[in-house]
């Protein structure tokens, strides 16, 4: 089987597609819902592999995330860099979004291509509240990334004092 070239999109179509992803970035739930009702795929991804859910969650739009999850958007769909929406929310320290994604079925142990979990992201960037929530949802303290780093080791490497303290406590 040969790879067929991707179809070229005209400028009008390209602009429409760009606007779709802007709706997610901006949290325009009303317009997105209209389009989802008309058959817009909830797992549509852009040229970077970012899904509508990834963009809405990264930009903190809880209502849009709830909408996309209701339309069966995959909370574990990774972008081309291998990142999940949960890891993005953990990196940003958005506790409410982390909780929402977990409630929507996100895998607490879902790792990127280099083995980094959401707990590792929270640990590295000193997001102690998020790290505590992830631990409460079953994130593994002993998980290792491709370099063999645990969340605690990653936090130490980044001088993330609050998460070092949290992860150093007996569990």
Swiss-Prot record:
InterPro entries cross-referenced by the UniProt entry: Ankyrin_rpt, Ankyrin_rpt-contain_sf
Start and stop residues of the ANK repeats: 48-77, 81-110, 114-143
Keyword presence, Repeat: yes
One Pfam family linked to the record: Ank_2
Keywords: ANK repeat, Repeat
Official protein name in the record: Putative ankyrin repeat protein PA3287
Originating species: Pseudomonas aeruginosa (strain ATCC 15692 / DSM 22644 / CIP 104116 / JCM 14847 / LMG 12228 / 1C / PRS 101 / PAO1)
């Amino acid at each position: 089987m040969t790879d067929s070239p991707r179809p070229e999109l005209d400028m009008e179509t390209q602009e429409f597609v760009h606007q779709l992803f802007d709706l997610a970035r901006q949290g325009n739930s009303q317009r997105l819902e209209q389009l989802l009702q008309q058959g817009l795929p909830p797992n549509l991804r852009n040229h970077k592999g970012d899904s509508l859910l990834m963009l809405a969650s990264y930009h903190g739009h809880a209502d849009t995330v709830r909408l996309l999850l209701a339309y069966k958007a995959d909370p574990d769909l990774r972008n081309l860099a291998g990142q999940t929406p949960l890891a993005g929310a953990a990196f940003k320290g958005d506790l409410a979004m982390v909780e929402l994604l977990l409630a929507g079925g996100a895998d607490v142990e879902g790792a990127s291509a280099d083995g980094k979990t959401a707990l590792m992201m929270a640990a590295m960037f000193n997001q102690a509240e998020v790290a505590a929530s992830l631990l409460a949802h079953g994130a593994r303290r002993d998980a290792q990334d491709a370099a063999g780093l645990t969340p605690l080791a990653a936090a130490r490497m980044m001088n993330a004092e609050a998460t070092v303290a949290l992860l150093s406590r007996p569990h």
